[in-house]
């Protein structure tokens, strides 16, 4: 198995924004602190091979959210900051496909394969991955280039960020996507 430039795989970087650096805001615990570094490695590969890149930016409609466009947390993290000519998709819901032209852009470019990395595993990454799979794209979800935060259960129990992350990945694997690592992708592109 290999992904070649000819296959035109797109890299979707989901919500790698400064607001996610505020761990306390999101629950107090985060897994995989190296996720952005792994995403940056993928981005460098895509840039060097001149393959399509889509930066997805969550623009919360909640004026109090640190991901609202008026807040500095809305900005992309420097490690994956878009360069001139790279497509930015702005969304205000969990899916990068809802209320955006992402599907149209992918289809117009005859892209059949998407590689997904970003934040957070159980929210926007999961929703976008599910929709990409439902739309028929060949989806690779990069486990070490995604991360999430701890959650409180409906009965008040605490779930660690790692448990939430692994459960989200398990729910997506082999149904909506192939869950793989950055190293796996490096070997096949």
Tell me what each language-model feature is:
Residues 1-10, 37-41, 48-49, 61, ...:
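Active-site-adjacent betaalpha module
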Residues 11-16:
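N-terminal nucleotide-binding beta1-loop-alpha1 segment
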Residues 4, 20-21:
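Active-site gating/metal-coordination segments in enzymes
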